Amino acid sequence: MRVYVLNGPNLGRLGTRQPEVYGTTTYADLVELCQQTGRELGLEVVIRQTDAEQELLGWLHEAADLGACVVLNPAAWSHYSIAVRDACALLRAPLVEVHLSNIHAREEFRHHSVVSAVATGVICGLGVDGYRLALHHLAARAR
């Protein structure tokens, strides 16, 4: 089963951007974690990161066309991008929204995600373990 792991703006800066909020794991470490977890679960993991909303929309459309599951960390786009929300609504397979930090324990403007309403589930505040949990959930659903 193919699973897209898609990451939005600034996630390529993991490890150096606000480590007190996002931890010290680098983006390269996150990629390896997702690939390793995918191998253990028999998943084909396609992992991507972008700072360009248009690019993320294209990847979501690709996943929708293929009927692929998605693990999505929309980052800042969670809070205001109706375009990302609408692209997620096109998905025919499960979508798990992931956030490294607990968005409900941060600034007020981060408390609401427009994506959550169309997600199968949401994992937040568990750091990079959230990605591992999302992949395990999708693998279990496929059985």
Curated annotation (Swiss-Prot):
EC number: 4.2.1.10
Domain of life of the native organism: Bacteria
Annotated SUPFAM superfamilies: Type II 3-dehydroquinate dehydratase
Catalytic activity of the protein: 3-dehydroquinate = 3-dehydroshikimate + H2O
Pfam family, any one: DHquinase_II
Family matches, as InterPro entries: DHquinase_II, DHquinase_II_CS, DHquinase_II_sf
GO molecular function: 3-dehydroquinate dehydratase activity
Site feature (Transition state stabilizer) residues: R17
GO biological process, one term: chorismate biosynthetic process
First-tier enzyme category under EC: lyase
Residues holding substrate: N73, H79, D86, L100, S101, R110
Positions of the catalytic residues: Y22 (proton acceptor), H99 (proton donor)
Pathway listed: Metabolic intermediate biosynthesis; chorismate biosynthesis; chorismate from D-erythrose 4-phosphate and phosphoenolpyruvate: step 3/7
NCBIfam families, sorted: aroQ, PRK05395.1-2, PRK05395.1-3, PRK05395.1-4
Subunit structure as annotated in this protein's UniProt entry: Homododecamer.
UniProt function note: Catalyzes a trans-dehydration via an enolate intermediate.
Family: Belongs to the type-II 3-dehydroquinase family.
PANTHER family: CATABOLIC 3-DEHYDROQUINASE
Protein name from the UniProt record: 3-dehydroquinate dehydratase
Source organism per UniProt: Salinispora tropica (strain ATCC BAA-916 / DSM 44818 / JCM 13857 / NBRC 105044 / CNB-440)
